[in-house]
């Protein structure tokens, strides 16, 4: 793995097909319960098996295979530098082209991605599958916008991760289907860390229509 200072990389899954595929290329695998409701619960369960000697635990989810290593490095650095934050997650400022794509997806009834709004010091205010904030205008394709695309990668302090499964699913998490809202609904601080794509193509798997797009991007990058 290209991430600097990663002490250990583990694949957590409840599926033997994934376990077998991962073990075939030498990965360490932890089998978790089928009862995990989301990736954060799965990460918490896996961490409970591995011990508590780590300062930061990162959850890099399988639906974001194009996540570059510098996103993860920025999260870890941001969390370690901010003792008031319990979780860190990356955000990308949308240019007009990306914003238009999100808006077109929503008009078609699809979720193009999750957006985030945050206040002073990067403190998250809300995450939504709707496009927020409302802008009321159009932007040139390469113009920066006030909309930030949330990338579903998380860096946790172990104590915050450990308590997460004990909380019930809140109304906002249930409505949006966004696991990170459980932290906000329980008064924990989520740090949004702005990252840059550096010319790297990026997309997440949110809809079946995203599969060929991701496969094409991976082929262009030589990782398919």
Regions found by a protein language model. Name each.
Residues 68-167:
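Conserved core of the sugar-phosphate nucleotidyltransferase
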Residues 6, 52-54, 82-87, 188:
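Short, high-confidence coil segments that cap the C-terminus of an alpha-helix
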Residues 52, 127, 141-224:
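Conserved alpha/beta core of the MobA/IspD/sugar-nucleotide pyrophosphorylase nucleotidyltransferase superfamily
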Residues 11-12, 33, 154, 204:
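Active-site-adjacent beta-strand anchor residues
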Residues 1-8, 20-25, 185-186:
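A short, N-terminal amphipathic alpha-helix
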Residues 10, 16-77:
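Short phosphate-binding loop-to-helix
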Residues 9-11, 57, 87-88, 124, ...:
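Hydrophobic/aromatic residues located in beta-strands of well-ordered beta-sheets
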């Amino acid at each position: 793995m290209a991430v600097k200072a990663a002490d250990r990389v583990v694949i957590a899954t409840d599926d033997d097909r994934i376990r077998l595929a991962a073990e075939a290329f030498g990965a360490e695998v932890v089998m978790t319960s089928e009862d995990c409701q989301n990736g954060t619960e799965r990460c918490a369960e896996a961490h409970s098996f591995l011990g508590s000697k780590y300062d930061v635990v990162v959850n890099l989810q399988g639906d974001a295979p194009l996540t570059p290593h510098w996103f993860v490095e920025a999260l870890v650095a941001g969390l370690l530098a901010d003792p008031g934050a319990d979780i860190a997650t990356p955000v990308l400022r949308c240019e007009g082209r990306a914003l238009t794509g999100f808006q077109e997806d929503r008009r078609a009834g699809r979720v193009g991605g999750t957006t985030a709004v945050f206040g002073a010091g990067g403190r998250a205010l809300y995450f939504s599958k709707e496009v927020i904030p409302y802008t009321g205008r159009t932007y040139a394709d390469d113009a920066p916008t006030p909309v930030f695309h949330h990338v579903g990668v998380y860096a946790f302090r172990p104590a915050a991760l450990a308590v997460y499964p004990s909380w019930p699913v809140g109304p906002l998490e249930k409505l949006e289907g966004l696991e990170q809202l459980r932290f906000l609904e329980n008064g924990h601080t989520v740090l949004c860390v702005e990252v840059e794509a550096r010319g790297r193509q990026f997309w997440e798997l949110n809809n079946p229509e995203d599969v060929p797009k991701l496969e094409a991007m991976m082929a262009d990058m030589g990782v398919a």
